């Protein structure tokens, strides 16, 4: 196992700060009802479609009615994308998972 160089750590920190800056910008855009135009500016149509697909993946994984292979066929997503979603969901904080269940599966009740 190799250690990251200080440069790599610095780059990682810079990227993290850029991500936090984007999140803050998005929060402000929501507060000012500019979130849709901001997201359309920042994301390509393909990226917006990919985010929609990821929401569906999480929703279906939470629902638990389809296998990952069935999800792949249903959504046209790669099995690696579905597996990453599954692994991320498993490591998500309990509060987030509960919120996602309440929010995404509300129509099931």
Curated annotation (Swiss-Prot):
Recorded GO cellular component terms are: cytoplasm
Q: Name one Pfam family in it.
A: Trp_repressor
- Cell compartment(s), UniProt: Cytoplasm
Q: Give the annotated DNA-binding region, as residue ranges.
A: 68-91
Its function, per the record, reads: This protein is an aporepressor. When complexed with L-tryptophan it binds the operator region of the trp operon (5'-ACTAGT-'3') and prevents the initiation of transcription. The complex also regulates trp repressor biosynthesis by binding to its regulatory region.
Against Gene3D superfamilies, the record matches this protein to: TrpR-like (1.10.1270.10)
Q: How does it assemble?
A: Homodimer.
Which GO MF terms are attached to this record? DNA-binding transcription factor activity; sequence-specific DNA binding
Identification of the protein by name:
Trp operon repressor
Q: Which GO terms describe its biological process?
A: negative regulation of DNA-templated transcription
Q: Does the keyword Transcription regulation apply?
A: yes
Q: According to its UniProt record, which protein family does this protein belong to?
A: Belongs to the TrpR family.
Task: Give yes or no: UniProt keyword Transferase.
Answer: no
**What are the record keywords, sorted?**
Cytoplasm, DNA-binding, Repressor, Transcription, Transcription regulation
SUPFAM superfamilies tied to this protein: TrpR-like
- InterPro entries per the record? Trp_repress (IPR000831), Trp_repress_bac (IPR013335), Trp_repressor/repl_initiator (IPR010921), TrpR-like_sf (IPR038116)
Task: Give the encoding gene's name.
Answer: trpR
């Amino acid at each position: 196992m190799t250690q990251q160089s200080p440069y790599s750590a610095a780059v990682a920190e810079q990227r993290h700060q850029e991500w936090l800056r984007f999140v803050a910008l998005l929060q402000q855009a929501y507060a000012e009802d500019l979130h849709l135009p901001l997201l359309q500016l920042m994301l390509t149509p393909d990226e917006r479609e990919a985010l929609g697909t990821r929401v569906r993946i999480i929703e279906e994984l939470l629902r638990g009615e389809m296998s990952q292979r069935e999800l792949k066929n249903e959504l046209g997503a790669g099995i690696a994308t579905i597996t990453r979603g599954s692994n991320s969901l498993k490591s998500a904080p309990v509060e987030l998972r509960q919120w996602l269940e309440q929010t995404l599966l509300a129509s099931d009740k």
